[in-house]
């Protein structure tokens, strides 16, 4: 029995009841020794062939052999058939065509004079009047020849006068610069001032600079000392056990509890409420699903069909 408030083994597995036994005393048959068509081996209804796929072969048709559509018939003209249908439709007419008792009603709206008092006005008649033959007017007088293009590449076609030609030297800019440079050197009074000494700053960058050479650096000779091996002042302390080698003394034993115990613990004798378990279900596989799984699989889903009873 499980502890109070626990679950049973069946509930822990996930089932709420023990599964029923499928067979009683039947021997196990491996899947290799089983028949290919289990339903046919048990004298059950055999499944017919599946749905036919559309193809050019004879299996794609419903008849066992190909049947001609117009076998034993002559050539038929579509116009002849159409006229024959028209004659048969005309025979169904009982009398002449229906004629209304009154004449056709004229429209009374925009552009119509039906229903007006005066009728149409002859001045606004829609009849075309005879006209004289059209004579094209002559060309305008030309005071100047026609302009050519937009002006680029053509002379004397703009509003203003054409600019007069003025010759310019090839090196005009170079000659102007040379002339200005000569005028600048003419205004100078003499050669630029040049100091005959090496340029130096007002003050030396190094304030501790001295022209005298410094004496050589004296190196102190160090005496070689022979170091002895290190020996500890006291032996090493062992961990655990004896605490005589520690810095602090071992605390004395005290029987007093760290926390005062309570005389009565609340809730220890109270019973835990467990609600009664209701009806529980277990997973059940449908018989229809099992039948579909056996009859329809990945190999025969194209050729299988619904059996008729």
Curated annotation (Swiss-Prot):
Q: Where is this region: Disordered?
A: 220-249
Which tissues is it found in, per the record?
A: Detected in testis and fetal liver.
Name the UniProt key words of this record, in alphabetical order. Cytoplasm, Cytoskeleton
Name a single GO cellular component.
cytoplasmic microtubule
Write out the annotated subcellular location.
Cytoplasm, Cytoskeleton, Microtubule organizing center, Centrosome
The record's principal subcellular location, in a coarse class, is cytoplasm
Enumerate the PANTHER family for this protein: UPF0602 PROTEIN C4ORF47
Family according to the record: Belongs to the CFAP96 family.
Designated name of the protein: Cilia-and flagella-associated protein 96
Q: Which organism is it from?
A: Homo sapiens
